[in-house]
Amino acid sequence: MLTITSYFGFLLAALTITSVLFIGLSKIRLI
């Protein structure tokens, strides 16, 4: 149970970081 929870949390964190980096690159390109 703990392994699944930590894996889900890690996946969510990775997705969030990827989204933030993608949005940041998009803003830089637009500017």
Swiss-Prot record:
Keyword set includes Chloroplast: yes
Membrane topology (UniProt): Single-pass membrane protein
Main localization of the protein described in the UniProt heading: plastid
SUPFAM superfamilies in UniProt: PetL subunit of the cytochrome b6f complex
GO process terms (BP): photosynthesis
GO molecular function: electron transporter, transferring electrons within cytochrome b6/f complex of photosystem II activity
Family matches, as PANTHER family: CYTOCHROME B6-F COMPLEX SUBUNIT 6 (PTHR37266:SF1)
Compartments reported by the entry: Plastid, Chloroplast thylakoid membrane
GO cellular component, one term: chloroplast thylakoid membrane
InterPro entries per record: Cyt_b6/f_cplx_su6
Keywords assigned by UniProt, alphabetized: Chloroplast, Electron transport, Membrane, Photosynthesis, Plastid, Thylakoid, Transmembrane, Transmembrane helix, Transport
Gene label: petL
Family label: Belongs to the PetL family.
Lineage of source species: Eukaryota, Viridiplantae, Streptophyta, Embryophyta, Tracheophyta
Descriptive protein name: Cytochrome b6-f complex subunit 6
Function in brief: Component of the cytochrome b6-f complex, which mediates electron transfer between photosystem II (PSII) and photosystem I (PSI), cyclic electron flow around PSI, and state transitions. PetL is important for photoautotrophic growth as well as for electron transfer efficiency and stability of the cytochrome b6-f complex.
Subunit text: The 4 large subunits of the cytochrome b6-f complex are cytochrome b6, subunit IV (17 kDa polypeptide, PetD), cytochrome f and the Rieske protein, while the 4 small subunits are PetG, PetL, PetM and PetN. The complex functions as a dimer.
Organism: Arabidopsis thaliana
TM regions (residue ranges): 4-24
